[in-house]
Amino acid sequence: MELSYQEKLTLIKLNELKKAKFDELVEKTGLDQVAVMRAVLWLQSKGLARLHEKSERIAKLTETGKKYAQIGLPEWRALKVLRKKGKVTLDDLKEVLSEDELKPIVGLLRKEGWASIRKEDGKLVLEITENGLKAEERAIDRALKLLAEKEAIPVSEIEEIIKVNDLKRRKIAEEDIVTERTVEITPEGEELANKGLELKEEVSTLTPELIKSGKWREVEFKRFNIQAPVRRIYPGKKQPYRAFLDKIRRRLIEMGFIEMTVDSLIETQFWNFDALFQPQNHPAREWTDTYQLKYPKSGYLPNKELVERVKTAHERGLAGSRGWGYVWSPERAMLLMPRAHGTALSGRQLAKGVEIPGKYFTIQRVFRPDVLDRTHLIEFNQVDGFVVGEDLNFRHLLGILKRFAVEIAGAKKVKFLPDYYPFTEPSVQMSAYHPELGWVEFGGAGIFREEMTRALGIDVPVIAWGIGIDRLAMFKLGIDDIRYLFSYDLGWLREARLVW
């Protein structure tokens, strides 16, 4: 069996003593307490020694208690003056009592029946009673005397005289826990020690001096157990979800996408709905599905030509469409709201101008009324994007979406279902299979309708998607509650795995 120098020394000395108090063993080995404790614990893990620990509650005097042990308890000092004078005022007691002691002791003298209290000429007067003249040593006095004689006494011994809480209440004594440790050699340890152990001091560090002198050839180096349990270290790292978003962004840029950015979380309904060919009477524009700003209520519309084309698309249609057939309201389009989906930025970018062919994306915070649960939030992130080009079709879109789910989220199974959105045709919903939650919807996609793209100045196909990136993160981070992404739980933040 392999033992370190300190373990060998401790075992040899323990074999001489057979059983010893820990402090005695420390003295016998000449090592410090930490080294002996470490050696004992290792010997115990190897079955060569046993460590016994016995904890006991003890009571000891506080600084106040030590003062009382020297000059007497306040009530006895006050009673001494009363016995001498028979009757005293509070000013008389101030000669022997501090301000802190005076008020409680007056009450205590009356409670013990040692003095009566009355007013004379507007002053409080204390007069000694028969009980005060005959007062004898009490339990608290005996306990104080006992504590003064010894440095510490077991609580059980003190409580044969008085409850320790009574002493603590008067700040005479305090309670502590002491642990007595005893170390005992086992038969296996005794057998090994009797065989003879070679004590050769070990070197734990290879120094330049050892190398220069050549002594490194003669000394014995301490062996290190690389499998020994050690304290876990939690180095600084990015918030797991934030790190995931950064890697999504980097991956999309590597795939040739250009990031669309915007400073504000607030949009006009024009960009959130109207520019996307969503009619003003659509139920998704009501308070049940979107938030509205109370103040300021309205913003500004973009250039007149763009507004006129959007209005025409809604009222009469573009690209062979008949439109929605209603009177479009610019006042409704000017209303302000927290962004409900990242597609609003896609509309802005298309109106601003794009490269053809071109690929664009954005990661944005969006807001929607919902019931909070483990798969739904009212404030969350979306990855929205689009690809614009001459020969794009629906199959290209499905390929991009599947690549997202499999390569970026790590989903094993993906399925597509037909869906409806006012601004895409055809439209599709994408879901992926989560091992805990089953099929989880990620988002929607489709080909932007020509009524939308023509109004924004684009006359080639545009395939687009909006994906709930928070739900993708659930797959990659291995969690089954979306709320953990924004959690302050230190345990989760420390243990959450870093993604690829």
UniProtKB/Swiss-Prot annotation:
Its main location: cytoplasm. L-phenylalanine binds at residues 343, 382-384, 423, 448. It is an enzyme of class 6 (ligase). It catalyses: tRNA(Phe) + L-phenylalanine + ATP = L-phenylalanyl-tRNA(Phe) + AMP + diphosphate + H(+). Binds 2 magnesium ions per tetramer. It holds the Pfam family tRNA-synt_2d. GO terms for biological process: phenylalanyl-tRNA aminoacylation. Mg(2+) binds at residue 425. SUPFAM superfamilies: Class II aaRS and biotin synthetases (SSF55681), Winged helix' DNA-binding domain (SSF46785). Keywords: Aminoacyl-tRNA synthetase, ATP-binding, Cytoplasm, Ligase, Magnesium, Metal-binding, Nucleotide-binding, Protein biosynthesis. It comes from the Archaea. Its cofactor is Mg(2+). This is Phenylalanine--tRNA ligase alpha subunit. It comes from Thermococcus onnurineus (strain NA1). The gene is pheS.
